[in-house]
Amino acid sequence: DSSTSRGLGDVYKRQKYYNPQAPGDQNSGMNIITMRYADILLMYAEAVHETSGMTEEVWNKTIRPIRERAGFTADAALNFPAGKSKEEMRQIIRDERRVEMAMEGLRWYDIKRWKAGNEYLSGKVRGASFVDENKLDTRKFEEARDYLWAVPISEINLNPNLAPNNPGYGN
């Protein structure tokens, strides 16, 4: 898969917003970035791929500069992977987004936009352990409920035309 070709496996090293010279644990003084250029490039790569297919030209303007900025130099990581199917290329772009945007709070929205909840949000919970108290071992993504938020009851009370609530939520 594409994370293996990047030499990452399943390991993430948290470097975002980290300043090794800052005193204390959370005193970096670095501003939180709400949107990054890499996010724009990845959205563009995804949109082009879904509408007309990824090309080497688009790859070299989007994915390649992201990987170069991250320090990759191997041809396997930088060069356009010619001969991939539409689905394989889609997965490469999604994996790139997963790695590049890690811990920035966008993954949930990506999965919902892709309508890929059953693939990514069901089954065994994997990933880093941040808090030992979390004992969730498995989860079940429910398509009818989990792609939409509940309409707040206060809004339904103000405007009864909003009833009934979205599937999976009471009124």
Residue map of PLM features:
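Short, well-ordered junction/capping motifs at the entry into regular secondary structure
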Residues: 1-2
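Acidic/polar-rich alpha-helix caps and helix-coil junctions
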Residues: 5-171
